Amino acid sequence: MNHIKKLYDWVLSWAASPYALTALFVLAFTESVFFPIPPDILLIAMAMGAVAKSFRFALICIIGSVSGAIVGYYIGNLAWLNSNGEFTGLANLFFNNIPGFTHELYNNIKILFDEWDFWIIFTAGFTPIPYKVFTITSGAFEMNTLMFIIASVISRGARFFLVAYLIWKFGPSIKNFIDKYFNWVALGFTACLIGGFVLIKYMI
């Protein structure tokens, strides 16, 4: 856990760097593929320091995150299984080094993807669920590429623009709320949204 804290602090240190915008893009990109620290923390720090640029920072986050998601998708699509249907060395590298990314989780996601692929990506992109797990598995399960990109743009856009809006609207005073409650609000909103669509589906 200590190494995660050090990584967290290292990411935050880029907020005051002349290369902060580049760091934000790279962080958002890599988090969609393998990096464990979400870009939100750097986005929040940068937006707090320049509130008027909050939406610009959010847009950079979105572009970086969706670009990384597409790379993750094609890693799953092209380099996840060999011709015999077995996991490649690259796949096992991810299983062995990304916390929480297990064979059991992979198999459970596979069952859900057949019916809920769009909503799975939306949920992973909008909530604190590890997005990288789903960008890769969506490619491995051959989710429709356009649908994957649309779900990623909508969910990542909603998440990062919402953070930017809260900071732009309320300023630094909103930071404690975002830190403590934003992920819970995101989870609750997503649960209600999906629940509503499920209810409509079974009523029609």
Regions found by a protein language model. Name each.
Residues L21, T30-M46, W119, F126-T137:
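Transmembrane helix boundary and interhelical junction motifs in multipass membrane proteins
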Residues D40, K132, F148, F160-A164:
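Residues that mark transmembrane-helix kinks and helix-interface sites
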Residues M1-V26, G49-T127, S152-I204:
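Membrane-interfacial helix-loop-helix
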